[in-house]
Amino acid sequence: MRVLIVKTSSMGDVLHTLPALTDAQQAIPGIRFDWVVEEGFAQIPSWHAAVDRVIPVAIRRWRKAWFSAAVKAERKAFREAVQAEEYDVIIDAQGLVKSAALVTRLARGIKHGMDWQSAREPLASLFYNQRHSVPKQQHAVERTRELFALSLGYSKPQSQGDYAIAQHFLNHLNADAGQYAVFLHATTRDDKHWPEANWRELIGLLAASGIRIKLPWGAPHEEARAKRLAEGFDYVEVLPRMSLEEVARVLAGAKFVVSVDTGLSHLTAALDRPNITLYGPTDPGLIGGYGMNQLECRSANKMLANLPASTVFDQLTSKF
């Protein structure tokens, strides 16, 4: 059986789809997947053994110059790639009108997705041949696992979902694997940031542990923050700019991770690494870290500035 997945973004949402592939792989011997995903996340599906072909899409970039000659050519090539094969099943796990109209509609095969009451944008359900009811009051991973089970005709396992990508990195770990922690300090929303003074206090509290700390970054202002956090601590390393695959390799070898609410915190969970995620205004209930050894540390008043470093340190030392 050949299946096309439409799950284009965000990083966390793409990662949250992986356990559903593992379920299907175990339920239907020989099943293979192609996957349409935003170009910035195209490395992720390739880490799962059940994925054959990754088809990058660039809707975010294309919409800035939709009718330019270059973008028209890219859109034509994308349409040809999506229509190159007729699929037994197409699963739109995105549930948005944009992806349904620009991607799912083009694909050849029976289209499955969530129904009017279940989809993130109800109008998206009009593009599907088969519509499934999936209750909203459950974690995003479980919703996607249920959608796949209904679309492919098996019972969703009751066990915790398995991302099944950690093994992709086991043979490529860095030489110092298990001897360092990673602090994921960068996120896109200001109210999700933990103050730099708190990060530095936590770094200081870990001095006696003998563990090294690595700080990744993705943009110049994040690099500048990482350098400020590391200043004066000889056991803290500011990493060079890295691809997503390279960051994943660093995370896969970490003894533990401390992160703000960001896509890389979900990548840490997908790699089965112990992680404490710091939450302020967001509710982790339906979209938080999913997996083994995923802990949450929340500010009492939803303001991360009021989450003491000592609280995070105590949780670290008691759990990891």
For each feature predicted by the language model, list its residue ranges:
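Catalytic machinery of carbohydrate-active enzymes
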Residues: M1-F320
